[in-house]
Every structure is written in C-alpha cells, then in structure tokens.
C-alpha cells in the first residue's frame, strides 16, 4: 500500500481475457486494517474501427463505461469518441453530459466544457503543436464569457523548439543533461540517473 494524507491506500486489479483492466478495488483507510473503505471501479470496452496508414481497418478497444462503487452508492460514466478515437463526451448515466471535448483538425484538444468543475477550458497551440495558453471561463457549452484565468507556456526559440522554458510567467532552468533544475523559486532534484 501507499500512504496518502495519513491514510493507507492499496489497489487490486482484475483483468479480462485480453489482459485489459476489468476492475480495480481501492482499499482506503487508516492503519486499522480491520475497517478500510473500499471503492471499486469496473470497466467495459467497445471496439473502435479506424483506417490505418496502409488503408487497413484497425480495431482498437476503447473504454465504453466506468462504474465506480463506493459505500454511499455507485455511478457509471459513459465515454463517446470521434472518428480519431478522441473522447468527445463523458456522460453520467445515459444522457447527462459531464464533460464535452473539442479538437482541431490536428487532433489537439482545444476546448473542454466541464460541468462538474463548473469551468470551460480553451487551449491554443503553436505551429509545432506546443501548448501556448490555457484559458479558463465559467462553464458554458455556448459562447464564451469573460476569461477568469490564463496560464501561459513559453518555449525555447533556439535549437530545441519544444523545450518548455516558462510556465505561467515563471522561468524553468535545466541542468546539463536536460532535467528541470529550478522552477518558481524551487530547486528540483533528480534521482536514478
């Protein structure tokens, strides 16, 4: 198990015949092993067909639904995809839309309408596909209102065009082997190399 905010958390996984996760059981509790709370998630899959590079038809299983069962009840979320396999809707039950996602012609996420968080997020990208900004608005599925928050991303314009050098106006410095060394006044350390 792992300790999260003073609580012991452990997970058990079940798999189907295709070795996909079919269920997860999370046991959450204090160090009293006799009374942990259990949250389970069960997954169902549906096949998504698309045309591969050689014009062959490829079949990819995508998550159709996730049912979460807790001591106080259960909830099922259903996933809908576009022709590229991008999630377009997450629904609670059959009809209540929880999240709606919009993509550009390159398959980059450009908008998320999230009714649970009460927010709509809009992303912009540069020509290389790097995120330039994420703007936050009050939740809407229609015309956007006033911007509530903007997060910006800055990149190296020299040799390595997709190297993130700033996040939300704060510089990111890298060490000699490419690991971030400082950000927002904090020193970052790396182990294992």
Walk through the language-model features, giving the residues of each.
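Acidic/glycine-rich beta-solenoid
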Residues: 1-193
């Amino acid at each position: 198990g792992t300790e999260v905010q003073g609580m012991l958390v452990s997970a058990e996984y079940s798999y189907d015949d295709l070795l996909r996760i079919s269920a997860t059981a999370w046991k959450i509790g204090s160090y009293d092993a006799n009374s942990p709370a259990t949250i389970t998630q069960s997954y169902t899959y549906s096949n998504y067909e698309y045309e591969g590079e050689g014009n062959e038809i490829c079949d990819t299983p995508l998550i159709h639904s996730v049912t979460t069962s807790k001591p106080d009840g259960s909830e099922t979320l259903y996933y809908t995809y576009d022709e590229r396999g991008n999630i377009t809707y997450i629904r609670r039950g059959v009809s209540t839309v929880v999240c709606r996602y919009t993509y550009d012609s390159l398959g980059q996420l450009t908008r998320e309408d999230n009714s649970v968080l009460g927010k709509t997020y809009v992303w912009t990208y540069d020509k290389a596909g790097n995120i330039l900004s994420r703007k936050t608005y009050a939740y809407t599925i229609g015309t956007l209102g006033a911007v509530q928050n903007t997060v910006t991303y800055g990149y190296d314009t020299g040799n390595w065009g997709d190297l993130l050098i700033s996040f939300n106006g704060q510089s990111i410095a890298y060490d000699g082997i490419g690991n971030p060394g400082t950000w927002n006044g904090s020193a970052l350390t790396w182990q294992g190399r």
